[in-house]
């Protein structure tokens, strides 16, 4: 389960713009998916938790994912959102790091 931050509607829009499908929603809860990755987004805000939460998503082609991320323009359209280009880290994995509007750090590899 992932916390949405202070604006649940904005969080849902962000993930939809990023390419996630909205599978279903109920008051205060939504399920989103992308390929084989699925998560529940909760209408909950806890800044300390959000700033210390990380999500990991495995993607088939990291470079293609980076191009899709750039093409989505979420980096320009959503305040506080930023990303680091594909980088090979000391632990031997290439990753894209994305900070979502709530401050959660996403690792795509």
Language-model region placement:
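Intrinsically disordered, low-complexity boundary segments flanking structured domains
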Residues: 27-28, 42-43, 69-75
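Vicinal oxygen chelate
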Residues: 55-105
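Short, charged/polar, Gly/Pro-enriched secondary-structure boundary elements
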Residues: 37-40, 47-49, 104-105
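Short beta->alpha transition motifs characteristic of CBS
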Residues: 1-4, 43, 88-92, 97, ...
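Short acidic/glycine-enriched loop/turn segments that link adjacent beta-strands
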Residues: 26-28, 49-50, 90-94
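Short amphipathic alpha-helical segments
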Residues: 1, 51-55
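Core segments of cupin and vicinal oxygen chelate
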Residues: 2-39, 45
């Amino acid at each position: 389960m992932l916390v949405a931050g202070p604006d649940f509607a904005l969080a849902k829009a962000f993930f939809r713009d990023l390419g996630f499908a909205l599978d279903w929603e109920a008051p205060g809860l939504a399920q989103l998916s992308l390929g084989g990755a699925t998560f529940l987004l909760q209408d909950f805000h806890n800044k300390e938790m959000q700033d210390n939460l990380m999500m990991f998503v495995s993607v088939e082609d990291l470079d293609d994912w980076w191009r899709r991320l750039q093409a989505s323009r979420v980096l320009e359209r959503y305040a506080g959102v930023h990303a680091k280009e594909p980088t090979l880290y000391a632990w031997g994995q290439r990753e894209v790091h994305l900070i979502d509007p709530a401050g959660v750090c996403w690792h795509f590899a």
